[in-house]
Regions:
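Glycine-rich ThDP/TPP pyrophosphate-binding loop and its adjacent helix/strand module
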Residues: 77-79, 83, 126-287
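Thiamine diphosphate
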Residues: 1-161, 287-348
Length: 348
């Protein structure tokens, strides 16, 4: 098996004490090194999915690396104080779970190079019992916070974290979970990646008036807002959340895919990074072996012919979208505005 071309042994397993909200220079340096290492690894192994034509998601796991490596250091320092699981209500950010499984030794790093490949046991959402090291199952947005409330109730005296997103917080399940967490004073901490990006575009444009902080404050949660790329501010907010009993939401403002040329701030970062952009990123970071491996991947071909089917293939959501566009294209702009109402489920 080909060796994973980015040296994950360079990860620095530091410990952080939540009673001290100020990072030392050494701690800050180690965290920043871990963040860069993990982000580079996520770019590489998710891009193998793009190279094979099986898709995937890069931006979500890439974006949330800073909070994940901080939590990892906290879990290592005070394991009895936490439920040491990176619960994530955005199932498509599964790259986080796979990478952390590899770092803890549950999953061979080389297996990451088969991300979303058939029979690799690395599907597009985490599946408990399928992938070594994965500790929960998670589907589409909005279904994990209620589950995490239950985990917290089952572990009194411990702090439970749930990685969230501004997209997830639009879902009704999360509204119910927020009200229950406040009513029962559940010790759950939400760390929300607020990048103003979903697959449909920018919520600030297509859902004006929606605000994550105001929404959660309205449910009764204490809310801390900060810059997700400012490691000192992020760590202070996480420490404050830990040291304050009850439900708290930390909202991290950041653009989608910070630092990735061609993707930063774009909703295209939600999906898997394209091979050309991944190659450009990895070359700039000096990962020549990763570049060589990506260039060597051959997209599988299917030579079978199916009766009644053409040569064009597409996902259900794309086929549906193209069908709608073909119908609307026969109408004038005035007619479309007068007769057509679009109700978007955010899964087109």
């Amino acid at each position: 098996m080909t060796t994973f071309p980015i040296d994950l042994s360079a990860y620095k397993p530091i410990s952080l004490d939540p009673s001290n909200p100020t990072l030392t220079d050494d701690q800050r340096s180690a965290l920043k090194a871990n963040i860069q290492l993990c982000r580079d690894a996520i770019i590489f192994f998710t891009a193998t999915g793009a190279a094979r034509g099986v898709g995937g998601h890069t931006g979500g796991p890439y974006d949330t690396v800073p909070e994940v490596v901080i939590l990892d250091a906290l879990f290592r320092s005070q394991p009895s104080q936490f439920v040491p699981i990176f619960f994530d209500e955005a199932g498509h950010r599964v790259g986080t779970q796979y990478l952390m499984s590899a770092l803890e030794g549950s999953l061979p790093a080389e297996q990451l190079m088969h991300y979303r490949e058939a029979n690799s046991k690395l599907p597009g959402h985490p599946e408990l019992g399928l992938t070594p090291g994965v500790k929960f199952s998670s589907g589409r947005l909005g279904h994990m916070w209620p589950y995490v409330n239950g985990v917290a109730l089952a572990n009194p005296g411990k702090t439970v974290f749930c990685l969230g997103s501004d997209g997830s917080q639009q879902e009704g399940n999360d509204a119910e979970a927020a009200r229950l967490a406040v009513a029962q004073h559940i010790n759950v901490k939400l760390i929300i990646d607020d990048n103003d990006v979903t697959i449909a575009g920018n919520p600030s444009k297509y859902l004006p008036g929606y605000d994550v902080a105001k929404t959660l404050t309205g449910h009764g949660l204490k809310v801390l807002v900060g810059d997700g790329e400012d490691i000192d501010s992020l760590y202070r907010n996480i420490c404050e959340a830990i040291n304050t009993p009850g439900p708290i939401a930390i909202i991290n403002k950041r653009p989608m895919c910070p630092g990735i040329e061609g993707l930063e701030g774009s909703n295209h970062g939600h999906d898997v990074i394209s091979v050309p952009l991944a190659l450009k990123y990895l070359e700039a970071k000096g990962h020549s072996a990763a570049v060589e491996y990506l260039n060597s991947i051959k997209k599988p071909s299917n030579d079978y012919k199916f009766l009644g089917s053409g040569d064009k293939w597409g996902s259900n959501r794309n086929v549906f979208g193209e069908a709608v566009v073909s119908l609307l294209g026969k109408m004038s702009e005035e007619e479309r505005k007068a007769k057509v109402l679009v109700v978007d489920s955010d899964l087109e």
